[in-house]
Amino acid sequence: LYLVFVVRDRKAGAAVAAAGLIWFAVATFGIIAHHSRQFYGDVAVEGSIYFKRYTHLGGGLGSILQALVTRPGEVLALLATEERLAYWPRILAPVGFLAALGPLELALAAPILAANLLADYPAMYSGEYHYSALVVPFAVAGAVTGAAWLTRKVAAWTGWPRARVLAGVCAWLLAWSL
């Protein structure tokens, strides 16, 4: 998406998207499905153990995607639960909430965020386990963009030198990362 909409290179964007989808399919339906049988037995639903975490939305990929389109109220109600809303501060606090000021970078993590927040497995939306690790690079990139934006805006509003404002933004980030 970034290559298509920001860089405006549709060929590269399509190539990266295709490679990503192919890798997702191989990893999810091949590698993980094969090795999950060692630990869970033959419990895969339509090819992947992960679909069991979305049975409240449907039994497989098609029915899950259909639920997202045909039952938006139920999906939004799920996303608005206290446990899932608590996920956001756990993801944003380590970067001083600055990623909220870099929404494009954070939006690139939408598939990962959706997978975590729509699951019925609490470890995926707790923000405390490895499931959230894939969001970290996007949160950091969003924080960098957010810090740059905030530095420019505060310097313009106050007339302070950018270096002074940036030092304050860095102190803010450091305080939140401790």
Model-derived features: where do they sit?
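Conserved acidic functional residues
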Residues: L1
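Signature aromatic-anchored transmembrane alpha helix within multi-pass, membrane-resident enzymes
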Residues: A17-I22, L150-L178
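Short, well-ordered helical secondary-structure segments
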Residues: W88, L101, E105, N116-Y121, ...
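Hydrophobic/aromatic-rich transmembrane helices and adjacent perimembrane loops
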Residues: A107-A156, G168
